[in-house]
Swiss-Prot record:
Belongs to the TACO1 family. This is Probable transcriptional regulatory protein Fjoh_2560. It is found in: Cytoplasm. PANTHER family: TRANSCRIPTIONAL REGULATORY PROTEIN YEBC-RELATED, TRANSLATIONAL ACTIVATOR OF CYTOCHROME C OXIDASE 1.
Amino acid sequence: MGRAFEFRKGRKMKRWSAMAKTFTRIGKDIVMAVKEGGPNPDANSRLRAVIQNAKAANMPKDNVERAIKNASNKDTANYKEILFEGYAPHGIAILIETASDNNNRTVANIRSYFNKCNGTMGTQGSVEFMFDHTCNFRIAKDGIDAEELELELIDFGAEEVFEDEDGILIYAPFGSFGALQKELENRGLEILSSGFERIPQITKELTEAQIADVEKLIEKIEEDDDVMNVYHTMKEE
């Protein structure tokens, strides 16, 4: 198995915050998708993907429909996606994806978390190159052979296809999302969820005490409502 498999296995044992936080993230994704491509999921592939993710997270249908309606209102503020980079203690690179309606607030908050936890906020491009930006899809098994599917999807950008207890996972470079989504839909395969992840190219092993130092910063960052995802180069068991 490749790095995507190991990455997924490691993160699975860790976080995904409380359900309320997950719903907040999906709500922001809906706003950004609607503002970008309109409220009709049939004509908006990004919104279609977010709705699939909402279903996978057991977000009530009424909540999704209400969020789409609110996002369609021109008075509803859009969110700007901002990427922050820096270092946690012990040389661990940190990459933070945010979606904010107030850039100044988000910058100040992220900077304060680094300062309070003995980290260092970096400049643009300081650690992003240490991560591979990927897209992923989870589809229903339905008797599908993962190895055969991988061979069939190589021309659409697929790099790694593997099975777990919840379905079949497909990983590809970030830029292959549209082509893969279209091909999976054309094949009539049920997409359970999809998204983007940044996979560290190299990870660093730490002692238990050092891990606690890094986790303190990560947890502080993840508590912020503007934060969507946090990635790092610390090795996870």
